[in-house]
From Swiss-Prot:
The keyword Disulfide bond does not apply. Tubulin is the major constituent of microtubules, a cylinder consisting of laterally associated linear protofilaments composed of alpha- and beta-tubulin heterodimers. Microtubules grow by the addition of GTP-tubulin dimers to the microtubule end, where a stabilizing cap forms. Below the cap, tubulin dimers are in GDP-bound state, owing to GTPase activity of alpha-tubulin. One of its GO terms (biological process) is microtubule-based process. Dimer of alpha and beta chains. A typical microtubule is a hollow water-filled tube with an outer diameter of 25 nm and an inner diameter of 15 nM. Alpha-beta heterodimers associate head-to-tail to form protofilaments running lengthwise along the microtubule wall with the beta-tubulin subunit facing the microtubule plus end conferring a structural polarity. Microtubules usually have 13 protofilaments but different protofilament numbers can be found in some organisms and specialized cells. GO terms for molecular function: GTP binding; GTPase activity; metal ion binding; structural constituent of cytoskeleton. Belongs to the tubulin family. SMART domains: Tubulin, Tubulin_C. This is Tubulin beta-1 chain. It is found in: Cytoplasm, Cytoskeleton. Keywords: Cytoplasm, Cytoskeleton, GTP-binding, Magnesium, Metal-binding, Microtubule, Nucleotide-binding.
Length: 448
């Protein structure tokens, strides 16, 4: 079976460990497992591909293939005392004592570097239990110190050790309005610099977009972090449907990348989910309503409006008892109506997949993954904030004090500016632009 090892780094609120734990809470229900990891499901479809994310331990108990990491003990204590306390393997929880103090350099070079070998031992042990490891997925935040600094260190080290395995990241980006840390632009830019080189696919999620969905669409006046994490876990559950249940398309991380990444550096995706309705207004939505909601910019979970750019590729994953014929018709309709938002020089750039098993508590749902040039809005915004601070050398001593060099900041800024330019270049490319088409044909990957 094609196993995936899940890593979650950084703490609290809407960061790696909380988002990761919400994901496990969602998928263990879908697969019919109880809080202790015993299978209580009714259908073989629930258990057929359990081994992708779960290892079978002795006495028929299933344990997540998960490694939980933080630089301070509080997060692990909270998970141990929570509803999934008995679910995770206790020796897969690795933590330091001091925290990263929202400093990327501490997570990447000092505190995190001291802990990383211990984490890699656990990762190796997990990899040895796999028959055919397809890759890794990591949940982390780019605004703090641990998720960003240590998260990217871990990605680089795992990449070094498993160079031919896939690396997917669920990265929570800082948002313009919901900011908790003054040095977020530094931490995020230094992280993106690493992700461009070391990740195969990065799903971008942003706090502000999640808050907006909770307030505007779900009518929650004061959304809690639990509400935000639940939204992210729904998207993660939708994205991984093809890996966990029988289906035709995007059946593993590599196929997902083949379908969505036309150029290796441009692997940053926006994601969306439907139905997003208040509990009171919930009704059975058909394919048409799901498609309409899913392509609504208000329901995209990152603060970039795809109408400001063009889709290079995108994928729609439907779940539940819905008609495949209707799905094809609706997607064709969306493309015809919004043809200006799709590049015309990548043929068949919209993929659809269908899985008959709906999420728990719903009859049908759809998940959207878009590789849109509009994602440059996020990088441009963070880059502008970075420049303002870096020109004044604000707070730089926090980083140089941990052994970092100013040159690293300059390189990270330059790499992110290049990324923005590349997205812009392919946004502007038209049918008559031979360069873009030739570049695409050269880069086009071959499926294994």
């Amino acid at each position: 079976m094609r196993e995936i090892i899940h890593l979650q780094t950084g703490q609290c609120l809407i960061q790696g460990n909380q988002v990761g734990t919400a994901f496990w809470q969602t998928i263990h229900h879908e697969h019919g497992l109880d809080h202790d990891g015993y299978f209580r499901g009714e259908s073989t479809q629930q258990s057929d591909r359990l081994s992708v994310y779960f290892a079978e331990a002795s006495n028929n108990k299933y344990v997540p293939r998960a490694v939980l990491v933080d630089l301070e003990p509080a997060t692990m204590d909270a998970i141990r005392s929570g509803p999934l306390g008995n679910f995770f393997r206790p020796d897969n929880m690795v933590h330091g004592q001091s925290g990263a103090g929202n400093n990327w350099a501490k997570g990447h070079y000092t505190e995190g570097a001291e802990l990383v070998d211990q984490v890699l031992d656990v990762v190796r042990r997990e990899a040895e239990t796999c028959d055919s490891l397809q890759g890794f997925q990591i949940t982390h935040s780019l605004g703090g110190g641990t998720g960003s600094g240590m998260g990217t260190l871990l990605i680089a080290k795992v990449r070094e050790e498993f160079p031919d395995r896939m690396m997917a990241t669920f990265s929570v980006l800082p948002s313009p309005k919901v900011s908790e840390v003054v040095v977020e632009p530094y931490n995020a830019t230094l992280s993106v610099h690493q992700l461009v080189e070391n990740s195969d696919e990065t799903f971008c999620i942003d706090n502000e977009a999640l808050y907006d969905i909770c307030r505007r669409t779900l009518k929650q006046a004061h959304p809690s972090y639990g509400d935000l994490n639940k939204l992210v876990s729904r998207v993660m559950s939708g994205l991984t449907t093809g890996f966990r249940f029988p289906g035709q398309l995007n059946a593993d991380l590599r196929k997902l990348a083949v379908n969505l990444v036309p150029f290796p550096r441009l692997h940053f995706f926006t994601v969306g989910f439907a139905p997003l309705t208040t509990a009171a207004a919930y009704q059975n939505l058909g394919v048409a309503e799901l498609t309409q909601q899913m392509f609504d910019p208000k329901n995209v979970m990152s603060a970039s409006d795809f109408r400001n750019g063009r889709f290079l590729t995108c994928s729609a994953i439907y779940r539940g008892k819905v008609s495949t014929k209707q799905i094809e018709e609706q997607i064709r309709g969306v493309q015809a109506k919004n043809s200006a938002y799709f590049v015309e020089w990548i043929p068949n750039n919209v993929q659809t997949a269908h899985c008959s098993i709906p999420p728990v508590g719903m009859n049908a749902s759809s998940t959207f993954i878009g590789n849109s040039t509009a994602i440059q809005d996020i990088f441009r915004r963070v880059g502008d904030q970075f420049s303002v601070m870096f020109r004044r050398k604000a707070f730089l001593h926090w980083y140089t004090g941990e052994g970092m060099d100013e040159m690293e900041f300059t390189e990270a800024e330059s790499n992110m500016n290049d990324l923005v330019s590349e997205y812009q270049q392919y946004q502007d490319a038209g049918m008559d632009d031979d360069e873009a088409e030739e570049a695409y044909e050269e880069e086009e990957p071959v499926e294994e």
